[in-house]
Regions:
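Active-site-proximal structural scaffolding
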Residues: 22, 29, 33, 52-55, ...
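Feature representing long, continuous alpha-helical segments
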Residues: 57, 83, 87, 176-179, ...
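Intrinsically disordered, low-complexity N-proximal targeting/linker segments that flank membranes
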Residues: 90-181, 186, 190-194
Length: 280
């Protein structure tokens, strides 16, 4: 992808000229690859949550072509680039952009990245390049968003969803964990006799409500340990939590007894945030 137009993984593409260019530039190439994966690590991705390794190739290409491999990891530099790179990673994972025909996907992206006029990582131009391809489109339909918000905590996609929602966090300097807002332990011990009717019991015990993105947040490692199984209302009040930054609905009762209202309101809130995050 770095040194020729045909990026297919074929023996014929590794001619003497390409091999020579790799040899001459190997230290910069290696450094670009290393810092790209270090960025993913800083953003909280691991081998489980970052399944489509091809998604890092455009980032490596951009870092190398802009010659920023020695500075991109510095906290105060290239903040907009890193924000857009992280957005690309999250949405490309959720949409399964590299689920098939990865060569054609990378060829399209290379055409965008080859533009010498780009000033920051060109997420919007990449999105536009796939706008007419339903299979690779980076847009999120209402139906898709509904499904995304049902993503379970242990799903490989869960971290990508939360990282997209919590795009305002300081990923370069803080490590974040997935955390239940209303503690999971409260739901696991419920019995039908705890409720006036079976429908309410079914709502509380449905994993699509209590164990999905609708009841999850990204919390710093230290805060997550201290929060433990504390009631949501108590945690918010005792720690003077900023509801807006935590993506918690305002002007509702956060008691466990009002969990259905919490889920309804948070679904509306997260839907708006997702649409805003992707520019729709």
């Amino acid at each position: 992808m770095l040194f020729q137009e045909n990026i297919k993984f074929q023996v014929t593409n590794f001619n003497a000229s390409v091999v020579c260019q790799f040899d001459e530039n190997w230290e910069r190439i290696r450094k670009s690859i290393e810092v790209a994966f270090e960025l993913l690590k800083k953003w909280g991705f691991n081998d489980s949550s970052f399944r489509a390794k091809n998604a890092v190739i455009p980032i490596v290409y951009y870092i190398y072509s802009k010659a920023i491999e020695n500075d991109i990891l510095k906290d105060r530099l290239y903040q907009e680039d890193k924000k857009l790179m992280r957005k690309w990673v999250c949405i490309s994972l959720l949409k399964g952009v590299f689920g098939g025909h990865s060569d054609s996907v990378l060829t399209t992206i290379k055409k965008v990245l080859s533009d010498k006029e780009i000033k920051v990582f060109p997420y919007e131009k990449i999105k536009l390049a796939f706008a007419s391809d339903d299979a690779k489109s980076l847009t999120l339909s209402d139906e898709f968003i509904d499904d995304v918000l049902k993503t379970q905590k242990d799903s490989s996609n869960c971290y990508a969803v939360l990282a997209l929602l919590y795009s305002h966090l300081h990923y370069d300097t803080v490590s974040y964990h997935k955390d239940h807002l209303h503690p999971a332990s409260h739901f696991l011990k419920l019995k039908p006799s705890d409720f006036a009717d079976i429908n309410t019991y079914n709502f509380y015990t449905n994993p699509e409500n209590w164990n999905s993105v609708l009841n999850l947040q990204l919390l710093s490692a230290n805060s997550n340990e201290s929060k433990n199984d504390e009631e949501l209302k108590s945690w918010v009040e005792s720690n003077n939590i900023d509801l807006e930054s935590r993506l918690i609905p305002k002007n509702i009762n956060l008691e466990f007894s009002d969990f259905p209202v919490f889920i309804r309101e948070r679904k509306e809130l997260l839907t708006r945030i997702l649409k805003s995050a992707i520019g729709e």
